[in-house]
Amino acid sequence: MNNSELKTLIKKQKTNYSLDQEFYVSQHIFDLDVKNIFSKQWVFVGHISRIPNYGDYFLFNIGKESIIIIRDKDNAVHAHYNVCRHRGSQICLENEGNSKVLICPYHAWTYNIDGSLKGARLMDKDFNKNDWHLHKCNSKIFEGLIFINLSDHPNDFEEFIAPTKKFIEFHGLADAKIAHRQYYPTDGNWK
């Protein structure tokens, strides 16, 4: 599907009707969604109850990016790109788990939960570990809900959350727990 076909598809969309099938299955439309929505806006990725303990983590994959959401020993939540700074390998290969350090399976570079480089084998003596931390992903927690933003210059979170703030606060989600999760594989995108 090209942009001209997409414009035609949008023009023929009827108000108050469900979207045409292409909006759910087209790779081109999904790529545009990632570029224009998910790469620029705050995105809800999960609830803090999903990572209750020190070292608990889960991955959130968005487009071609994989983000590690992990809790440290002070209960702070960090979001890092799941990419080793050495050779670009993915660090966490499991979708969720617990780890007190993040170890790249390729050359065993080791990172602290805060993203700082803890160890890198066989590097020159003038190698500065402080220059090789994991890339952080913008993140905020509001009422127990974890949000990330992939943009280098994210829009203001307070402005983003303002229209729904009172509704979210009313439900006391900071104290909520996930009772059960179920995965349903589908041949479609996020819509």
List where the protein language model places each region.
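Rieske [2Fe-2S] iron-sulfur-binding subdomain
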Residues: 1-76, 110-191
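Short cysteine/histidine-rich zinc-coordinating motifs and their immediately flanking basic loops
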Residues: 94-99, 115-119
